[in-house]
């Protein structure tokens, strides 16, 4: 069995990859997109966090995934589960999170960690709140498009007539709930066919590890970013409608 971790950005992509690797799977480090992948395992943490574009390799997703070996995992925001029948030897771990959390987290990643996104840098926009509004205007819709694709995956899983989408090869989770206690880790380990007794230690080891975009040294007042302008832009994204639809589909969000 191979594993593809499909996430909304900032919903535990690298955290889940690290955790699952500690359960006995091999992390390729492939961050998969449609026509390329980031070869994160071939570069150090500094390069991955600040200059991820340097790790980019051109290759169609199908080629990247089908070349993987049994027991390996890859990850990304590209909706491979929408084509799950093309990958019968894959198990899909799908992780979502509330957009108020993912939007802020991705903004912080773009502004404070990455050094290859000039339009959102502190040199370009001095005030953090203005920069957050600029991020929401320029990138918010793209972010919510990925959210909508996760909704699409869930809708197909919930539809009994869509027999190509097999429940037994998909595990859906809320990343914030996953972090709250061992129950989520135990459930994921069991879903992957791993002894659940291994999960608590693996989870604590991953918590202590430095993964690619974990905010361990950034002090940002996230609440203060939500000024009136940011709230107005957020409302225009219809993000809460996405959240409500997720709840209707059974999401714990």
Spans of features found by a protein language model:
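PAPS-dependent sulfotransferases, especially Golgi type II membrane carbohydrate sulfotransferases
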Residues: 1-2, 160-164, 192-253
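Phosphate-binding beta-loop-alpha motif at adenosine-nucleotide cofactor sites
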Residues: 165-191
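Short amphipathic alpha-helical segments that mediate assembly, nucleic-acid/protein binding
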Residues: 57-61, 129-133, 143, 230, ...
């Amino acid at each position: 069995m191979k594993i593809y971790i499909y996430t909304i950005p900032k919903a535990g992509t690298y955290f889940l990859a690290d955790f699952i690797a500690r359960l006995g799977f091999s992390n390729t480090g492939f961050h998969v997109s449609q026509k390329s992948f980031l070869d994160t395992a071939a570069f150090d943490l500094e390069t991955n966090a600040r200059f991820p574009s340097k790790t980019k390799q051109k290759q169609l997703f199908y080629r990247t995934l089908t070349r993987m070996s049994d027991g390996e995992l890859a990850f990304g925001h590209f909706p491979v589960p929408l084509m799950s029948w093309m990958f019968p030897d894959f198990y899909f771990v799908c992780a979502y999170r509330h957009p108020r959390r993912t939007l802020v987290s991705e903004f912080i990643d773009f502004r404070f960690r990455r050094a290859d996104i000039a339009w959102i840098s502190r040199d370009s926009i001095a005030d953090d709140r203005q920069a957050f509004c600029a991020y929401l205007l320029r990138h918010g819709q793209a972010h919510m498009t990925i959210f909508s694709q996760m909704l699409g995956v869930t809708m197909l899983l919930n539809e009994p007539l869509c027999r190509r989408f097999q429940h037994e090869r998909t595990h859906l989770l809320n990343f914030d709930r996953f972090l709250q206690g061992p129950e989520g880790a135990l459930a994921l380990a069991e879903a992957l066919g791993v002894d659940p007794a291994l999960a608590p230690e693996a989870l604590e080891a991953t918590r202590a590890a430095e993964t690619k975009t974990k905010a361990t040294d950034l002090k940002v007042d996230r609440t203060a970013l939500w000024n009136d302008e940011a709230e107005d832009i957020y409302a225009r994204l219809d993000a809460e409608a996405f959240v409500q639809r997720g709840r209707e589909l059974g999401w714990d969000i």
